[in-house]
From Swiss-Prot:
Entry annotated with the keyword Transcription: yes
InterPro entries (UniProt xref): DNA-dir_RNA_pol_bsu_ext_1_sf, DNA-dir_RNA_pol_bsu_external_1, DNA-dir_RNA_pol_su2, DNA-dir_RNAP_su2_dom, DNA-dir_RNAP_su2_hyb_sf, RNA_pol_bsu_bac, RNA_pol_bsu_CS, RNA_pol_bsu_protrusion
Keywords: DNA-directed RNA polymerase, Nucleotidyltransferase, Transcription, Transferase
Taxonomic lineage from the root: Bacteria, Bacillati, Bacillota, Bacilli, Lactobacillales
Protein task: DNA-dependent RNA polymerase catalyzes the transcription of DNA into RNA using the four ribonucleoside triphosphates as substrates.
SUPFAM superfamilies cross-referenced by the UniProt entry: beta and beta-prime subunits of DNA dependent RNA-polymerase (SSF64484)
Gene for this chain: rpoB
Quaternary structure (record): The RNAP catalytic core consists of 2 alpha, 1 beta, 1 beta' and 1 omega subunit. When a sigma factor is associated with the core the holoenzyme is formed, which can initiate transcription.
Top enzyme class: transferase
Reaction(s) catalysed (UniProt annotation): RNA(n) + a ribonucleoside 5'-triphosphate = RNA(n+1) + diphosphate
Name of the protein this chain belongs to: DNA-directed RNA polymerase subunit beta
């Protein structure tokens, strides 16, 4: 028998798939959320300590007191994750820091542990819980600190160069050439000064010294000529210093001293200027002589300074081989020259640089100095004079054609700031603010009794951390529609945020796909719209190194033997540029050598065919190019990229269904993405399952300890979907660390299951699938195939008001007993009650504003106490479209010790659960960007059926395929049908999946027709349709855009204050805008009365609409409309501009426009239904009250009279 296509692979303990992959996986996928967890772990282990060491010790102004850092520790968290969620608190641990205060006068030392506030902790899932809600800190993609060179063309078309030294924090140093070939520098974006002025200010004053250092060049001569010695009384250095000071502080008196201090503070003070580790690494790398000298011709003989033997002769071309012999000498400081700056320079320490003379590529006769910065250690975090001189040298060399310009969009020049670093920067800001306070307190307070505790004010530190988690652009409310959305959110890279780009300033280049993204950032997954290309996703195998650069793994190719080894090297983008990398699908022999002599490979931005002896590395996997969500699309290679982008983005919006089903046609990514997402319940230790039920799983470890795992049931996710876990292990089952114990939402047997496998036919039907609409069988409704559970949270708080506290109660004015039937004695809805729109959830009354009481009422108040005070009903009611079943009620009170915000006495939260079946108007999609709206749900019996009588589930429009070029859906359809017939699951990994032949082979194996099409019969008549139709199984998902959330109609609602027109939008219970073009339509139709009422009663004729309502209620004819409010606003606007504007009628008599006064307030905010009811009851109450007051008055008068008589 012929062997079947594909081979069986096991995913987790519970699922086997037939995989069509041809390439064996050399490397396991890393943990997909390690970018979050590792970064935060680094912060706790090292980052925090670094901060304290940076800021402390703090000395007072006289240098007598010094506050030093000893150690820090995080204590036990106050709440567990679950408690923090329930109490709306932060999941955080108290940070305690041990500090030592030394008094240098007395030698006294005091050590003390100081509390530094609560520090938010990361959960195991890579999220933070802030105020009870899960948040994710998105990693930021920023320009790396370092030195950059760029070409520029001025308006006359003359080419020039520019350079920038960018620190992590501190002043930028820029250099540029002008049209006259003069080089200038700018410090921190101020006015430019000639380059030589800065060199002189650094202490190298004379022209001779400058030419000695840099060598001769045209630009340098022009610059020196421009920079004349103006004031003979100053040395050249002092004059240079004054020139610099004038640019930085224009208008202030300039002295050499103040300039020295300024430059020192700007560039050489570690507190104000910081290159960071990464900046120092990038500067040393860019100014490295080993790369700069490659392929140049030496203009001097290089001699070993120790032995005196010649290393390389003059005139030698420095090829890679020559460079290899030379490299160790350069590293040891070959040709080092030490220059001594004059005493009045900014930095007086001697400066050592390496100078090697080469011939200019533009003019082989001329010698050029190439200056290296002498490799300062990585501990030197500020810029040194040697760095400035070496970068100037690089800049001048560029004009000679030596060196190359940088591409700022290259991932070698962009780095990632993850959680740890973002937090560290924020913490540093807090500590720096605190430092000021500490200094002040040191000088004010009595030194004898001072303790560290008294010096420290932790407010700024706490505030900066709180601000970061609460309101930073990078701290985001987690997208929790389903586990894939959660996972993708944690792996997101944003170029926006503080220190990043802004949407408006970002051009095309930044947003575009760059060759260096390969294996580092996904070229597919990015949002559509204004953020396209600014928000990206990390590729599946990518890691972030200690400098923040993204690395991707490659298999090393042994150059000697030509074998592809299993040794994996992680390369950053700039290192990869030096190598040639073969593609992952290059065929290999058994022994690991290439099967062909020529392979497809990449060298920088080129795709080449190269001979195998030139190949250095090979890709580890075909899916290393794309992100996790993209890797979940089968037959991705057959889809157009725009549609694949939509497919990747829409999978994140899939709503978790009641009984999820993993795809029959998967990619093999389903298990890993579900496992790492944080939504599944994972086993922490090996053991045996001892107890399983819906709410708890217990595992007995091999060492006898018992682990208990709580299973989450129906928790509301951030997006209002139901997060529910279901155990998939059974009693006595042996489990290992990392096994899935319970499926989370949108998971089945440990695999991601976002949708359902349904029988799909590509055919039109009565025009119901026009414009991508979807026709669906009623079976999908009846069998709850696309039914999802949604939980909404409503809250009501009882506050203290000026007029007295609000009260949660069952006694609500003007509400019948029937409306209170489901409220308990406190006035809170019972769990399990079924509620409709407008039903009471929490009864609450608020004291009404008491107007100035009359004498009689004051007397009454004195006699009868509180009775006379009115309250109004401010109960929590179910909003429109919010009906369902009460799932849970949480009550928080001060007495119970819950932390409530100031002024709140009680908080009630009600959770209402809805079971939503699929509906016309719901949005559905496949995985290939093929989205549509359900247009008709038809009875099963009317759907077209297969020859064996099976009715199909969904009909899609065949016209949606060719123009969109997402052919992957058709291949999925056929392979899915074959999988259904064979009763198997298949895996077709991206770029290495089932080929055309594999699909047809499987189709044949399943016994389907050779074209995989079938004849369909009309369900209504039983007649066959004309052509053969493609029918198969496609994985379709229901998206979060559901019609229940969008359907909306206004009855009586709020009006805008100024124009008095109805508000817009569902949230405001607004109306539909009847705009200019709609008015034209009614005018064209001649519907004058309809138009009149739309522009008056239904909109902003304030008096008219109230009168109309009353007329409808009383059954009287509707009165004539008045003048719309917006017209009055327009007239008043013109009057306010000083135009005498009046409105006249036909007879030229003036129409009076009503003027607003205080009485109109209630007229404006009309909520007519309740208002009418209130008026009626108010009249009755007034009548009763008046009668009562009259009776009381008679009694009182009588009592007075009696009393007077008695006195008489």
């Amino acid at each position: 028998m012929k062997s079947l296509a594909g081979h069986v692979v096991k995913y987790g303990k519970h699922r086997e798939r037939r995989s069509f992959a041809r390439i064996s996986e050399v490397l396991e996928l890393p943990n997909l959320i390690e970018i979050q967890t590792d970064s935060y772990q680094w912060f706790l282990d090292e980052g925090l300590g670094e901060m304290f060491e940076d800021i402390l010790p703090i000395d007072d102004f006289n240098g007598n007191l010094s506050l030093e850092f000893v150690d820090y520790e995080l204590k036990e968290p106050k709440y567990t994750v679950a408690e923090a969620r329930a109490h709306d608190a932060n999941y955080s641990a108290p940070l305690h820091v041990t500090l030592r205060l030394t008094n240098r006068e007395t030698g006294e030392i005091k050590a003390q542990e100081v509390f530094f506030g609560d520090f938010p902790l990361m959960t195991e899932q890579g999220t933070f819980i802030i105020n009870g809600a899960e948040r994710v800190i998105v990693s930021q993609l920023v320009r790396s600190p370092g030195v950059y060179f760029h070409g520029k063309v001025d308006k006359n078309g003359k080419e020039g160069f520019g350079s920038t030294v960018i620190p992590n924090r501190g002043a930028w140093l820029e250099m540029e050439t002008s049209a006259k070939d003069i080089s200038y520098v700018r410090i921190d974006r101020t006015r430019k000064i000639p380059l030589t002025v800065l060199v002189r200010a650094l202490g190298f004053g004379s022209d001779d010294t400058i030419f000695e250092i840099f060598g001769d060049s045209e630009t340098l001569r022009n610059t020196v000529e421009k920079d004349l010695h103006k004031n003979a009384s100053d040395s050249r250095t002092e004059e240079g210093l004054k020139d610099v000071y004038e640019r930085l502080r224009p208008g202030e008196p300039k002295t050499a001293d103040s300039s020295r201090n300024l430059l020192n503070a700007r560039f050489f003070d570690p507190k104000r200027y910081d290159l960071a580790n990464v900046g120092r690494y990038k500067v040393n790398k860019k100014l490295d002589l080993k790369t700069r000298l490659l392929n140049l011709t030496l203009a001097e003989t290089l001699v070993d300074p120790e032995t005196g033997e010649i290393i390389v002769e003059k005139g030698t071309v420095l090829t890679h081989q020559v460079m290899e012999t030379l490299a160790p000498f350069i590293d040891n400081g070959l040709n080092s020259v030490t220059y001594y700056p004059s005493e009045d320079g900014v930095v007086t320490d001697p400066m050592t640089v390496q100078v090697i003379k080469v011939f200019s590529p533009k003019d082989p006769e001329r010698e050029v100095n190439v200056i290296g910065n002498g490799y300062p250690e990585s501990a030197v975090k500020t810029v040194r004079p040697a760095d400035i001189i070496a970068s100037m040298s690089y800049f001048l060399n560029l004009m000679e054609g030596i060196g190359n310009v940088d591409d700022i969009d290259h991932l070698g020049n962009r780095r990632i700031r993850s959680v740890g670093e973002l937090l560290q920067n924020q913490f540093r800001i807090g500590l720096a603010r605190m430092e000021r306070v500490v200094r002040e307190r040191m000088s004010i307070q009595d030194t004898e009794t001072l303790t560290p505790q008294q010096l420290i004010n932790i407010r700024p530190v706490v505030a900066s951390i709180k601000e970061f988690f609460g309101s930073s652009q990078l701290s985001q409310f987690m997208d929790q529609t389903n586990p894939l959305g959660e996972l993708t959110h944690k792996r997101r890279l944003s170029a926006l945020g503080p220190g990043g780009l802004t949407r408006d300033r970002a051009g095309y280049e930044v947003r575009d796909v760059h060759y260096s993204h390969y294996g580092r950032m996904c070229p597919i997954e990015t949002p559509e719209g204004p953020n396209i290309g600014l928000i990206n996703s990390l590729s599946s195998y990518a890691k972030v190194n200690k400098f923040g650069f993204i690395e991707t793994p490659y298999r090393r190719v042994d150059r000697e033997t030509g074998r592809v080894t299993d040794q994996i090297d992680y390369l950053t983008a700039d290192i990869e540029d030096h190598y040639i990398v073969a593609q992952a699908n290059s065929p290999l022999n058994e022994d690991g050598t290439f099967a062909q002599d020529v392979v497809m490979a990449r060298a920088q931005s080129e795709n080449l065919e190269v001979s195998i002896d030139k190949v250095d590395y090979m890709d580890v996997s075909p899916k290393q190019v794309v992100a996790v969500a993209t890797a979940c699309i089968p037959f991705l290679e057959n889809d157009d990229s725009n549609r694949a982008l939509m497919g990747a983005n829409m999978q994140r919006q899939a709503v978790p269904l009641i009984n999820p089903q993993a795809p029959w046609v998967g990619t093999g990514m389903e298990y890993k993405s579900a496992h790492d997402s944080g939504a599944a319940l994972l086993c922490k230790h090996d053991g045996v399952v001892e107890f399983v039920d819906a709410s708890e799983i217990r595992v007995r470890r091999d060492n006898g300890a018992l682990d208990k795992y709580a299973v989450t049931k129906f928790r509301r996710s951030n997006s209002g979907t139901s997060y529910n876990q279901r155990p998939i292990v059974h009693l006595g089952e042996k489990v290992e660390k990392g096994d899935t114990l319970a499926d989370g939402p949108s998971m089945e047997q440990g695999e991601m299951a976002l949708g359902q496998n349904v029988l799909v036919g590509f055919m039109t039907w009565e025009g119901y699938n026009y414009e991508d609409a979807i026709i669906m069988s009623r079976r999908l409704v009846k069998d709850d195939v696309y039914t999802s559970i949604h939980i909404e949270e409503y809250e009501s708080e009882a506050r203290d008001t000026k007029l007295g506290p609000e009260e949660i109660t069952r006694e609500i004015p003007n509400v019948g007993e029937d409306a209170l039937k489901d409220l308990d004695e406190m006035g809170i809805i019972r769990i399990g009650a079924e509620v409709q729109d407008g039903d009471l959830l929490v009864g609450k009354v608020t004291p009404k504003g008491v107007t100035e009481l009359s004498a009689e009422e004051r007397l009454l108040h004195a006699i009868f106490g509180e009775k006379a005070r009115e309250v109004r009903d401010t109960s929590l009611r179910v909003p429109h479209g919010g009906g369902g079943i009460v799932h849970d009620v949480k009550i928080f009170t001060r007495e119970a010790g819950d932390e409530l915000s100031p002024g709140v006495n009680m908080l009630v939260r009600v959770y209402i659960v809805q079971k939503r079946k699929i509906h016309e108007g719901d949005k559905m999609a496949g995985r290939h960007g093929n989205k549509g709206v359900v247009s008709r749900i038809m009875p099963e019996e009317d759907m077209p059926f297969l020859p064996d009588g099976t009715p199909i589930d969904i009909m899609l429009n065949p016209l949606g395929v060719p123009s969109r070029m997402n052919i992957g859906q058709v291949l999925e359809l056929h392979l899915g049908m074959a999988a259904r017939q064979l009763g198997i699951h298949v895996a077709t990994p991206v770029f290495d999946g089932a080929s055309d032949e594999d699909v047809w082979e499987t189709v044949r194996e399943a016994g389907m027709a050779s074209d995989a099409k079938t004849i369909l019969y009309d369900g209504r008549t039983g007649e066959p349709f004309d052509g053969r139709v493609s029918v198969g199984v496609m994985y379709m998902i229901k998206l979060a855009h559901m019609v229940d959330d969008k359907l909306h109609a206004r009855s009586i609602g709020p009006y805008s204050l100024v124009t008095q027109q109805p508000l817009g939008g569902k949230a405001q219970f607004g109306g539909q805008r009847f705009g200019e073009m709609e008015v034209w339509a009614l005018e064209a139709y001649g519907a004058a009365y309809t138009l009149q009422e739309i522009l008056t009663y239904k909109s902003d004729d304030v008096v008219g609409r109230v009168k109309t309502y009353e007329a409808i209620v009383k059954g009287e004819p509707i009165p004539k409309p008045g003048v719309p409010e917006s017209f009055r606003v327009l007239v008043k606007e013109l009057q306010s501009l000083g135009l005498d504007m009046r409105v006249l009628d036909i007879k030229d008599s003036e129409i009076q426009l009503r003027d607003m006064d205080d009485q109109d307030d209630d007229l404006i905010t009309v909520n007519a239904l309740t208002k009418f009811a209130e008026q009626q009851t108010a009249k009755e109450l007034e009548k009763k009250a008046a009668e009562q007051v009259e009776d009381e008055r008679q009694d009182i008068i009588q009592n007075f009279e009696t009393a007077e008589d008695n006195l008489d």
